[in-house]
Amino acid sequence: MTDSRSIRFDGRPLAIEDVCAIAARDARAELSADPAFRARIRRGSEFLERLLREDGVVYGVTTGYGDSCTVVIPPELVPELPHHLFAYHGVGLGRMLDPAETRAVLAARLQSLAQGVSGVSVELLDQLAAFIEHDVLPQIPAEGSVGASGDLTPLSYVAAALCGERNVPFMIARPSFGRRRSGWRRSVSSASAAGWMRPWNSTLRSPHSAAAT
């Protein structure tokens, strides 16, 4: 990293130049600690939980996807549904995205979720920000994306890494910003990488609980 400037994720618009700077490790991605921002994220998660209590049927949470939207998932199987979704879409092909491309994917997803309208937890945003900060980069194939949004396949690899599955190239030592070194990376399990990060960021919950909310 050539300088120590930070780009804050707080729900405000992000310029493409900001994403490029994070991708090149010319800037840090900093998730806002502002109480009002975090309260807004929590309200989104609480809204989803309230819908589940009052209605019990929410597309993609307690139902199947696409043409299976009329299939209601039994309550005892709902926690397993996200795992099946990212496993189903984890069939990408071709070369792996390079580190800069992968950082851009993570930054774009963090920016999207930081709007507070996705019903995710603050802990999930913290985990994504920690992946960028510590350069924990899921291995994402460049080909095979499907769906209207065009990002289901690549994001399935991000979700798997957040849940401690698949392998990631990971720094053996904590990154030293301002210096570029080679030979520090090896492939480790996502669970091992997340376990190494936790002492540096005590706010993280387990990858499973963070990704499930």
Language model: regions and residue ranges:
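Conserved, well-structured ligand/cofactor-binding cores
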Residues: 1-213
